[in-house]
Swiss-Prot record:
It comes from Chlorobium phaeovibrioides (strain DSM 265 / 1930). F(1)F(0) ATP synthase produces ATP from ADP in the presence of a proton or sodium gradient. F-type ATPases consist of two structural domains, F(1) containing the extramembraneous catalytic core and F(0) containing the membrane proton channel, linked together by a central stalk and a peripheral stalk. During catalysis, ATP synthesis in the catalytic domain of F(1) is coupled via a rotary mechanism of the central stalk subunits to proton translocation. This protein is part of the stalk that links CF(0) to CF(1). It either transmits conformational changes from CF(0) to CF(1) or is implicated in proton conduction. It is found in: Cell inner membrane. F-type ATPases have 2 components, F(1) - the catalytic core - and F(0) - the membrane proton channel. F(1) has five subunits: alpha(3), beta(3), gamma(1), delta(1), epsilon(1). F(0) has three main subunits: a(1), b(2) and c(10-14). The alpha and beta chains form an alternating ring which encloses part of the gamma chain. F(1) is attached to F(0) by a central stalk formed by the gamma and epsilon chains, while a peripheral stalk is formed by the delta and b chains. Keywords: ATP synthesis, Cell inner membrane, Cell membrane, CF(1), Hydrogen ion transport, Ion transport, Membrane, Transport. This is ATP synthase subunit delta. InterPro entries: ATP_synth_OSCP/delta_N_sf, ATPase_OSCP/dsu. It comes from the Bacteria. It is a peripheral membrane protein. GO terms for molecular function: proton-transporting ATP synthase activity, rotational mechanism. Belongs to the ATPase delta chain family. GO terms for cellular component: plasma membrane; proton-transporting ATP synthase complex.
Amino acid sequence: MSSVIASRRYAYAFLSAAEAGGFLETVTGEMQMVGETLAASRDLQRALASPLINADRKTHLLEEIFAEAVGDKMMLFLRLIAHKKRAGILGGITQEFAALLDEKNGIVNAAVTSATELSDSQQKALSRSLEGYTGKKVRSAMKIDESLIGGLSVKIGDTIFDGSVRHQLQLLREKLVAVEA
């Protein structure tokens, strides 16, 4: 089984259990903190993924790092992951948990790239437009790329809306080349 599929299954199972048990709000913050800790420590990621370190040692490592910072339910989940020899995909589990939670709450992530910085009113108008298109709440991550020349590009999931001047020039170039051929 691929690590992405396994990560999604563990994340879904934990999310479902947390929702049914009434502790979803608590573990949401804890899961985010675990993910941030993993993202910040390459050594921790390597240790958890290493086949040379046994499950008991990985459990002990997770307990040392997170026992004071997380509650009993989250610690039990971390022990389970280590016991099942899935500690190496813990980072993926935290990402999938966040994605499933967003899906449950009707939130989509949009990567917005513009040639210049958008004003607050432009960002709000863009968010309203994207929310109207998707029918969901939109969380935007803004980025500036001057090579777009003008306009902007928006990526939501697998869909890209490219309204940049660079893209329009590229389309025009392709049409001119096709006419010449």
